Amino acid sequence: MNSKNLAVIGECMIELSQKGADLSRGFGGDTLNTAVYIARQVPQQELNVHYVTALGTDSFSREMLQAWQQEQVKTDLIQQLDNKLPGLYVIETDDTGERTFYYWRNDAAARYWLDSPQAESLCAQLARFDYLYLSGISVAILPPASRVKLLALLRQCRANGGKVIFDNNYRPRLWQSQDETQQAYRDILSCTDIAFLTLDDEDLLWGKQPVEQVVSRTRDFGVSEIVIKRGADSCLVFSADGETEDVPAVKLPKEKVIDTTAAGDSFSAGYLAVRLTGGNAVSAAQRGHLTASTVIQYRGTIIPREAMPQ
């Protein structure tokens, strides 16, 4: 059996986490979390998981690459730019556990992956992939000219028989205006096959509406499979054939929930680990819930490998 190829497009940043006088360093990024959790759950004989971004030539970038390779995430499509560095963010946690995030990413390498001399040949490769996955953040960090190139890539991939998967992860501070975001999302959703939505992000971007209207709007853009993630509640899957599935979440005692940072990213990973290897939507959603419910029982976005559900 020929293994299929999935490219996950986005940005991973250096994470500094401060609690009191202690400062710990790690790496974080919504799409990177998803890539790692898919790679952990699908054998390479079935699916190759590639990460697509740009990094620097510094020691932090090299450390990232090594960490991802150890997770069986392929890094051969990642560009290293001489004069750029990864973005950086700091998480400050107060005495009540409330977290504040500070970002330094305006000139991060990931913003320029479509501007390099290699970008054209890279896009030609990606256009032949079976699946391309990206999030609202993957789009938000790009300059306008790069967004045009990204759209062209998504359209070409679909024209070649590939599928596009989009997570609506909306961060208002990364965009110039709501109008700009709405237009960008319209463009992306018009060439998306599977969309992961959270109602909080939808409400923030389009205004509060019932689920039925959210689904109707997304369908009108041309999306055939819509997955609505609802945290600790059941998720809703709206299939291309008009079927709707309401799949219960895994219930956890409150004291077991430690860190929900990567809950949505890991849900998407579990869902796709099943869906992209031939499983049905209900099995995929069940796996998504199982993955997310495991991840939130640990601190940090990437849990120990041995803690993964079987």
Predicted regions located by residue number:
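Glycine-rich phosphate/adenosyl-contacting loop at the front of the ribokinase-like
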Residues: M1-K74
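Active-site metal-binding loops of divalent metal-dependent hydrolases
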Residues: C12, N168, S266
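Conserved phosphate/ATP/ADP-binding segment of small-molecule kinases
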Residues: N160, P172-D246
